[in-house]
């Protein structure tokens, strides 16, 4: 609805993604021909992705953080977003241990978990620290929040992990409903 409202008053939104460790935007959701003709909900799904490398970035990719191999471009296999290029910091001031850990394998590790779409666009699913592991399954707090936000009565929500004796963790949602909701 935000995208559609902005477009209705002549504002064209562009989604960019970056981190403190990367100077300026590191990736941009570069709009492709034909996106404007799609229904608003489909345009929003495409435009909310983190995109492709920004012109000054050497590479943005999604790698398996253990094997350092690129995940399949299937929009499903989760890996970690990693950067390489001249706009990535050289290291953390007076913290060589953190610098070494962040640059294992020659890539800057963001801590953001994502998929690589077939069209090579990156889509973040969650932060590695926020993944809920329940009975051996990885549950993205962001995906649960996205599902909750689609309900017309939901104004705001947050999903966190709750300890569980059987499953290890289970999702717990804090939901604020709209005033007019019953």
Question: Positions of the model-derived regions?
Answer:
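AMP-binding/adenylate-forming catalytic core of the ANL superfamily
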Residues: 85, 90-94, 113-182
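Conserved AMP-binding/adenylate-forming
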Residues: 2-16, 20-121, 128-131, 144-145
């Amino acid at each position: 609805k935000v995208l559609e409202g902005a477009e209705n008053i002549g504002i064209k939104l562009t989604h960019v993604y970056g981190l403190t460790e990367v100077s300026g935007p590191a990736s941009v959701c570069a709009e492709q021909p034909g996106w404007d003709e799609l229904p608003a909900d489909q345009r929003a799904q495409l435009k909310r992705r983190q995109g492709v490398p920004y012109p000054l970035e050497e590479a943005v990719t999604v790698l398996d953080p253990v094997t350092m191999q690129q995940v399949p471009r299937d929009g499903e296999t989760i890996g970690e977003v990693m950067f390489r290029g001249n706009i990535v910091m050289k290291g953390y001031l007076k913290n060589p241990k953190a610098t070494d850990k962040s640059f294992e394998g020659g890539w800057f590790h963001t801590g953001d978990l994502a998929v690589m779409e077939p069209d090579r666009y990156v889509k973040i699913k969650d932060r590695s620290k926020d993944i809920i592991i329940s009975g051996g399954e990885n549950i993205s707090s962001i995906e649960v929040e996205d599902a909750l936000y689609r309900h017309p009565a939901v104004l705001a929500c947050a999903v966190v992990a709750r300890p569980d004796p059987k499953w290890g963790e289970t999702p717990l949602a804090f939901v604020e409903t709209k005033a007019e909701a019953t």
